[in-house]
């Protein structure tokens, strides 16, 4: 089984990925948060900063991800990204449920127009084949906009093209991250897909993974929030020791130092570290108390006192 780190915009940027790779690793691929190309001839510095090779550790096998519904924008951006050295794989995001993204018929909003999807894929694969670059084009998708009944028509489009890997998050856009993954929809994809599948959705514990792996013989799983919450999760799945407070503190301290170097103000660093605790507080026996201690901090002095209390007095599950 291959393990992939899912992208999460605003969270899994290069500073985060580098710290994770140094201290935990175990992941075969890291998918970068999406780049959204537009009418400009070239992607600008802010758009590509996260994937610049000099910003990413050699331990990070990074796959850039593009959010687009126009083939010309995708091709233009892909050429520039390939010139940066990313010549193995580009991932297309057709899963993002964000309202601002969906309103532009991008991400999971693209799923409402399968005819447009078909034209998009036809054009980009014709370009890829004529370019003879050997580039793998993979896709991350949801199962529909409002209802899983949309999924068979969506799969018909995917099955017409040589997608290197189809990562399925079996929720609709309407569900966002609510409810549970629709495994009936994944069952359907497992039976009919002509392309290799990767599963994404609610793998947060070793048991979650084992229950999935018993039923489905797929080559890869992509984990996002589960790995952000427990950075040792993939290693635990592989039989290594469970996450310890010492591991988590080392990780926290590394991220704090690294973010401190690039944040322009204390309030930005405080926000970033509170975001970290939004996920990792789940590991503690009293996760609500842990989260509350951090949430009420209004400055870094109080934040550091709260962190000292958490690691000094609270235990992991």
Task: Indicate residue ranges for each PLM-predicted region.
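Flavin-dependent oxidoreductase catalytic cores
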Residues: 1-317
């Amino acid at each position: 089984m291959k393990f992939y780190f899912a992208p999460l915009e605003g969270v899994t940027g290069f500073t985060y990925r580098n710290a994770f790779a140094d201290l935990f690793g175990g992941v075969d691929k890291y998918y970068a948060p999406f780049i959204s190309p537009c009418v400009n001839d070239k992607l600008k510095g802010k758009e590509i900063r996260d994937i610049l090779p000099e910003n990413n550790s050699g331990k990070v096998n990074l796959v850039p991800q593009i959010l687009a519904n126009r083939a010309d924008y995708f091709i233009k951006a892909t050429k520039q990204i390939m010139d940066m050295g990313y010549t193995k794989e580009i991932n297309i995001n057709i899963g993002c449920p964000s309202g601002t993204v969906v309103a532009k018929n991008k991400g999971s909003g693209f799923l409402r127009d399968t005819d447009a999807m078909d034209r998009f894929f036809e054009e980009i694969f014709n370009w890829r084949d004529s370019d003879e670059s050997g580039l793998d084009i993979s896709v991350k998708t949801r199962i529909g906009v409002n209802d899983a009944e949309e999924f068979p028509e969506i799969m018909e489009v995917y099955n017409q093209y040589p997608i290197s890997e189809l990562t399925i998050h079996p929720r609709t856009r309407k569900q966002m991250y609510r409810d549970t993954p629709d495994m009936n929809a994944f069952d359907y994809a497992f039976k009919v897909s002509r392309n290799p599948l990767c599963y994404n959705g609610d793998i947060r514990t070793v048991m979650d993974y084992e229950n999935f792996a018993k039923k489905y013989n797929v080559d890869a799983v992509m984990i996002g929030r589960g790995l952000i919450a427990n950075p040792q999760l993939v290693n635990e799945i592989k039989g290594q020791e469970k996450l310890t407070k010492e591991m988590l503190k080392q990780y926290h301290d590394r991220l704090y130092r690294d973010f401190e170097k690039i944040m322009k103000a204390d309030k930005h660093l405080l926000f970033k570290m509170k975001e970290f605790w939004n996920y990792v507080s789940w590991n503690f026996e009293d996760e609500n108390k842990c989260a509350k201690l951090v949430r009420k901090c209004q400055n870094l002095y109080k934040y550091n006192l709260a962190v000292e209390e958490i690691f000094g007095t609270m235990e992991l599950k």
